[in-house]
Amino acid sequence: MKYHAPINEEEKFDVILLHDVIEHVPAKGEFLLHLKSFLKSTGVLFVGFPAWQMPFGGHQQICRSKLCSHFPFIHLLPNSMYNSLLKLCKEEDGTISELMSIKECRTSIELLEKLIKRCEFSVVDKKFWFINPHYKQKFHLTPSLLPRFAWKIKYARNFFTTSCWYILNLSNT
């Protein structure tokens, strides 16, 4: 990683925000381990991201084509089909490259939770949103959490969680 970690506790951060960032990072584990060195021992890390399998988890809303930007789940197509569809809809090369990069970096709830354990963070709190709070401003929809029972249904929860919010701290191990 390019940025050198602070030398002493006073130079470290109380709060680090990763909102809609982690799903764009290829080496997530290495990145999170490096972030630990910037966090005060009493600090918290916020990680917010769209679950990969949710209807627009591939960020296809950035497409110019109405078909691609409004069609849910197309990012789950095999790479060759997805790439061909984007080209057929005349998406720009830069957009296609960005969408394929997001597809390569995809982040499921299970992946993040595995990384949290591997990187020795503890979960202070988490929320799985059925209707992302940002959708109030964007689409005039009322935010709502996924029902609690659904939080426990691994893999299936990814299809219904439009935003995952985690507050983490350093494990005392």
Q: Which role fits each region the language model picked out?
A:
Residues 171-173:
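Short loop segments at secondary-structure junctions
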